[in-house]
Amino acid sequence: MTQFEIECLDSKVYNARDHWSRFVIDPLKPGQGTTLGNALRRTLLSELEGLAITAVRIAGVSHEFSTINGIREDVLEILLNLKEIVFSGQLQESTIGRLTVQGPAIVTARSFELPPEIKLIDPEQYIATICGNNTLEMEFKIEVGSGYKIVEKDNSTEHFEFLQVDSVFMPVKKVNFRIEETRGENNILNEQLILDIWTNGSISAKEAISNAADNLINLFSPLKTIDGESETDYETNETSHINQILIEELQLSVRAYNCLKRGCAHIHSVADLLDYSQEDLIEIKNFGQKSAEEVIDALQKRLGINLPKEKTTKIYNK
């Protein structure tokens, strides 16, 4: 079977938050272009992770319909401007950013105080204008997610203090594709998939396709293990079978999967994971508590395996 190839035909950077690339994937058999195009488009738009502001606390403000003395924009306009801010970086759990500016001044994202692991894509993004000797002071939550998150009512004390923001996590803004017929060797009819991808600058289109492919591989990998073994045969070979299971079958998030398989740990199977305790997982470089809990939960629910809690004598590359 001829393996298809992907090539970047063209790319442009219109501004810091508007990148475009065009790819061609070929040769494909008739019908494969639509199958591949639909799967990639859906995954690129809805499943890739990104960072976004999800909540804001502004000094002296109790609700989103307030105005701030000496600030040209009302609170709702400021929230809409914050919603458009684009970040990049690796984040395991929510974090806090801050802004304090004394007027008169035009406030942009450049004035943000951010954790070192988070980067601004466009420091010139506009926030507000301060008139006179007034101060704009706020702090905001940054979270990792995918797709679009609509504000949900939350009466907890923490959420009461923060103004919630509809958040756009999607690093890919738009995807178009079309199918063209081509002729291969011996005049055989083939297809080629032309794929146009627009990103917000937090990742490149090439990275987006790679991440989408990882997601699709994780989705379909469990289908490879279907077999006709009887219940007796399965029970006899249960331990051996579990040890041979690849980590793809745990259906982990792309972040956790990449840290295990492509990071310094080089974990490829459940057998490899059994060498680790719960404390060992947390100490894997760039892994973190959230990813460790995801792996522990997947092993327990899918395979009935409970990792020991105590740390082993394993040596880690940090």
Swiss-Prot record:
Cell compartments where the protein resides: Plastid, Chloroplast
InterPro entries listed in its UniProt record: DNA-dir_RNA_pol_insert, DNA-dir_RNA_pol_RpoA/D/Rpb3, DNA-dir_RpoA, RBP11-like, RNAP_asu_C, RNApol_insert_sf
Entry keyword set: Chloroplast, DNA-directed RNA polymerase, Nucleotidyltransferase, Plastid, Transcription, Transferase
CDD domains: RNAP_alpha_NTD (cd06928)
A single GO molecular function term of this UniProt record: protein dimerization activity
Reactions catalysed: RNA(n) + a ribonucleoside 5'-triphosphate = RNA(n+1) + diphosphate
Region (Alpha N-terminal domain (alpha-NTD)): 1-227
Alpha C-terminal domain (alpha-CTD) as annotated region, ranges: 241-318
SUPFAM superfamilies in UniProt: C-terminal domain of RNA polymerase alpha subunit, Insert subdomain of RNA polymerase alpha subunit, RBP11-like subunits of RNA polymerase
Gene Ontology biological-process entries: DNA-templated transcription
Chief location category: plastid
GO cellular component terms, A-Z: chloroplast; DNA-directed RNA polymerase complex; mitochondrion
EC number, as in UniProt: 2.7.7.6
Coiled coil: none
Superkingdom: Eukaryota
Functional note: DNA-dependent RNA polymerase catalyzes the transcription of DNA into RNA using the four ribonucleoside triphosphates as substrates.
Sequence similarity: Belongs to the RNA polymerase alpha chain family.
Domain notes: The N-terminal domain is essential for RNAP assembly and basal transcription, whereas the C-terminal domain is involved in interaction with transcriptional regulators and with upstream promoter elements.
Subunit organization: In plastids the minimal PEP RNA polymerase catalytic core is composed of four subunits: alpha, beta, beta', and beta''. When a (nuclear-encoded) sigma factor is associated with the core the holoenzyme is formed, which can initiate transcription.
Descriptive protein name: DNA-directed RNA polymerase subunit alpha
Species per Swiss-Prot/TrEMBL record: Guillardia theta
